[in-house]
Amino acid sequence: MLAKRIIPCLDVTGGRVVKGINFEGLRDAGSILEQARFYNGELADELVFLDISASVESRKTTLEEVLKVSGEVFIPLTVGGGINSVDRAREIFMHGADKVSVNTAVVKEPELISRIAEKYGSQAVVVAIDVKKKDDRYMVHTHSGKIPTPLEAVEWAQMVQELGAGEILLTSMDRDGTQEGYDNDILAKVSTSVHIPVIASGGAGNLEHLYDGFTRGKADAALAASIFHFRQYSIRQAKQYLRDRGIPVRL
């Protein structure tokens, strides 16, 4: 079995790392560079940098910030926020990213997934899917969760796989920032409906939640923010906890 990954996420706006609840009520979570340096030395498997206001404000991710972070970390770096063209993806890669995360733009223009994948490889394309439960259906939202779409989560996940995505970052908007655990129902449905890796996101509040995301949710990786940003747990602690319970991790 492949090692499961632990991935801290830097949600960035206004030049700072922030964290909210249900995509709202943002609070400051520190310096971008300080957090990036910390995770680089903390056994994180990868780092995700998401400019969470770029799509909402119809602007591009700040390349200067991406360059600074890429110069500080020596683990795979995924960058997302406002990436709406192959040219923009190229700029992000040129500034040190290993992968790009696309969301709003590819809901509007799904073929963008294929165009980026053809140029840079599927392994470099992460499609972020933000979902909210409504009447027992999990619906995809865009613009940092602000705009609902008619797309259902499993259907969209299968579509992005066919278009060339190499990975899916699945976030439960209902669980985001609540620390109540991942939504393992939709996580398992998506994970078992595709053959590309799925990253669990939204709701991690303790180490058992990470374990549940891997066992009940069938995830390939677990993304978390609050529990690591505010030093509730270290990534080393998380990995040791998982290893002790039979989950393969890199230590």
From Swiss-Prot:
KW Cytoplasm (keyword) present: yes
What GO cellular-component annotations does this UniProt entry give?
cytoplasm
- Root EC class: lyase
Q: What's the main place this protein lives?
A: cytoplasm
Where does the protein end up? Cytoplasm
Annotated EC: 4.3.2.10
Q: Which InterPro entries match?
A: Aldolase_TIM (IPR013785), His_biosynth (IPR006062), HisF (IPR004651), IGPS_HisA/HisF (IPR050064), RibuloseP-bd_barrel (IPR011060)
Record-annotated active site: D11, D130
This protein's pathway reads: Amino-acid biosynthesis; L-histidine biosynthesis; L-histidine from 5-phospho-alpha-D-ribose 1-diphosphate: step 5/9
**A single GO molecular function term of this UniProt record:** imidazoleglycerol-phosphate synthase activity
Q: Which UniProt keywords apply?
A: Amino-acid biosynthesis, Cytoplasm, Histidine biosynthesis, Lyase
Share an example GO biological-process annotation for this protein.
Answer: L-histidine biosynthetic process
Catalysis performed (reactions):
5-[(5-phospho-1-deoxy-D-ribulos-1-ylimino)methylamino]-1-(5-phospho-beta-D-ribosyl)imidazole-4-carboxamide + L-glutamine = D-erythro-1-(imidazol-4-yl)glycerol 3-phosphate + 5-amino-1-(5-phospho-beta-D-ribosyl)imidazole-4-carboxamide + L-glutamate + H(+)
Subunit and partners: Heterodimer of HisH and HisF.
Q: What does this protein do?
A: IGPS catalyzes the conversion of PRFAR and glutamine to IGP, AICAR and glutamate. The HisF subunit catalyzes the cyclization activity that produces IGP and AICAR from PRFAR using the ammonia provided by the HisH subunit.
- Family classification: Belongs to the HisA/HisF family.
**Designated name of the protein:** Imidazole glycerol phosphate synthase subunit HisF
Organism, scientific name: Chlorobium limicola (strain DSM 245 / NBRC 103803 / 6330)
